[in-house]
Regions:
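Surface-exposed binding/hinge segments that line
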Residues: 8, 22-28, 100, 119, ...
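Short, well-ordered beta-strand elements
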Residues: 30-39, 86, 96-98, 118-121, ...
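Alpha-helical secondary-structure segments
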Residues: 34, 114-121, 153-159, 196-197, ...
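N-terminal lobe/hinge region of extracytoplasmic solute-binding protein
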Residues: 36-92, 123, 191-195
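Detector for C-terminal structural segments
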Residues: 41, 52-53, 57, 204, ...
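Aromatic- and charge-enriched surface segment that lines or borders ligand/interaction sites
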Residues: 53, 86-131, 157, 242, ...
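Gly/Pro-rich hinge or "lid" segments in bacterial periplasmic/extracellular proteins
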Residues: 67-75, 164-229, 235-237, 356, ...
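Extracellular/periplasmic solute-recognition and catalytic clefts
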Residues: 134, 148, 201-212, 229-290, ...
Length: 532
């Protein structure tokens, strides 16, 4: 098995090179890619952040052991290619994953990359090292990791407590770069050092992030760009006008609403625009330990009060999708089909019938037209959060709940919900990896840091482990759908809808592939070039 998989990696690399060779003749070196950003991150440390505005700009600073092919639109297990690894192999019992490593790779400060760096990174992620991450949002991904062992300087093995076929996909995410052993987590927050195609230059909060070409990159003749500059502008109308005026080459993927995309196409017909299935869901989180929301009947009433289709119609011109925890098809590989989704509590289209039940429950709990429940609805201070939060507040009025909007700066948002410093909130959750292990472990298992509302059902945890071990994909999907139903029955985190955002770029920008089932995994940027 080991020999077969390593050979596969080599052959796959040769095939990619052969396919790419003719196109390479037209590619040009040079130029700075100008991109606007919708917000300012708290730090530059991917492993300590949870928002795309922290991950995407510095994905090009790093490399992974393996990565989803940057030119395949839909992430899937067959689209994983080696990066700092040269291949991989599983043991017969599925509990050991071994990577031979690329030699001659240097960190941006000139020090050599070795197996020690891989071990250091996953010791940090698993919480087993002396130094600790200040925040470790994806620690739950590695709860099944027994440890990482080095075999000399250029081979590592991941030892698991039990089989977990999805581990390779987790390692292929943009959230899974290798960090250098010799740079502290503290320093990585302000000046990250990687092995990737671009070197970090500068981060000025609320202003810009700048990257420059890594002249010593291990992949020869890459990257094509001399650098990338991200400018932070929070006003949607302003940034769209600036893009149309030629100030930027590329919009921030997913941030262009359907109406704004129409504006760009009307005013700048030469622009190339795409609207892909959304992999980010808008959801309702309720602090289950904060009275009166510790009452499951009240939480059920709030879930029944939602008119999901209204969100889609108002915010996406009807182009968004209704879905559960797992991204629905056709963009997602694991989500429930519509006919199954509509059988879940609250997910059917009988809105008025559901709201009548919700009002009956609220009256039984002592609320009504003359005694309305007053709450704060917290959300992140960006349009993609604020706009649906306003609709949520309006809908809750139908069931005797009056909400007051509380907006929170991005740098404070995730720490706030992680420590459960809220009562009711509207949140957005992206599909980091389109696989049940990622979303279920990170957001729904007992005690996970991404489980912002404190949901805990030991029976669900057992099911999550069971599906994680299952090698048969169809059997695993059936288990994942069973978990979806239990989460809906528990009102764990009602999913409202999946957005459908757009992206546009100037015609001289080449080499972009926009992925349909993750906003996080397609931004290594080494193959993007400017036809100028």
């Amino acid at each position: 098995m080991t020999r077969h998989l390593r050979s596969y990696a080599v052959v796959a690399g040769l095939l990619i090179a052969l396919v790419a060779a003719p196109a390479a003749l037209a590619q040009k070196q040079g130029g700075i890619l100008r991109v606007y950003m919708i917000d300012s991150p708290a730090s530059m440390s991917i492993h300590e952040e949870s928002t795309v505005v922290a991950e995407r700009p510095v994905m090009g600073v790093f490399n992974n052991l393996v990565l989803f092919d940057q030119h395949v639109k839909q992430n899937n297990p067959d689209a994983i290619v080696p990066e700092l690894a040269t291949g991989w192999s599983w043991s017969e019992d599925g509990t050991e994953l071994t990577f031979p490593l690329r030699q001659g790779v240097k960190w941006h400060d000139g020090k050599p990359f070795t197996a020690k760096d891989v071990k250091c990174t996953w010791d940090l992620l698993a919480g087993r090292s002396e130094e600790k991450f200040r925040i470790n949002p994806r620690k739950a991904w590695y709860r099944n990791l027994e440890g990482v062992a080095t075999n000399g300087d250029y081979e590592v093995s991941f030892h698991l407590k039990r089989p977990q076929p999805a581990l390779l996909e987790l390692l292929a995410s943009g959230w899974s770069p290798v960090y250098p052993c010799h740079v502290s987590p503290r320093d990585m927050r302000s000046h990250p050092i990687g092995t990737g195609p671009f070197k970090f230059v500068e981060f000025k909060p609320n202003e810009h992030i700048r990257l420059t070409r890594n002249e010593d990159y291990w992949r020869k003749d890459r990257p094509y760009l001399d650098g990338v500059e991200y400018t932070m502008l929070k006003n949607r109308s302003t940034v769209i006008l600036a893009f149309i005026a030629g100030k930027y080459d590329l919009t921030f993927a997913g941030s262009v609403t359907i109406p704004l995309m129409h504006d760009i196409q009307n005013q700048m017909p030469e622009a190339i625009c795409q609207s892909n299935p959304g992999s980010v869901n808008t959801n309702l989180i309720i602090n289950r330990s904060a009275p009166p929301f510790d009452n499951p009947d009240l939480r059920r009433a709030m879930a029944l009060g939602l008119d999901r289709k209204a969100f889609v119609d108002i915010l996406t011109e009807g182009q968004g999708n209704l879905g559960g925890v797992l991204q629905p098809p056709p963009g997602g590989l694991w989500g429930l089909p519509t006919e199954v989704l509509q059988t879940l509590p609250g997910y059917g289209l009988e809105v008025e019938k559901n709201r009548a039940k919700a009002r009956q429950t609220m009256q039984r709990l002592g609320y009504g037209p003359e005694n309305r429940l007053k709450i704060k609805v917290s959300t992140r201070d960006t349009p993609s959060y604020r706009d649906p939060a306003v609709i949520l507040i309006d809908q809750l009025k139908q069931i005797y709940i009056d909400g007051e909007l509380e907006t929170v700066d991005t740098t404070r948002w995730y720490p706030k919900v992680m420590r459960k410093d809220y009562t009711v909130a509207l949140n957005l959750t992206g599909s980091t990896v389109d696989d049940p292990d990622q979303g279920l472990y990170e957001n729904y298992t007992c005690g996970a840091i991404g489980n912002y509302n404190g949901y805990c059902n030991p029976e669900v945890d057992k099911l999550v482990d069971r599906q994680s071990m299952e090698a048969d994909r169809e059997k695993r999907k059936a288990l994942a759908w069973e978990i979806e139903r239990k989460l809906a029955e528990d009102d764990a985190r009602p999913i409202i809808y999946y957005n459908r955002g757009g992206i546009c770029w100037r015609p001289e920008v080449k080499g972009i592939t926009v992925m349909v089932n993750s906003i996080y995994n397609g931004w290594r940027m080494e193959d993007i070039w400017l036809d100028k």
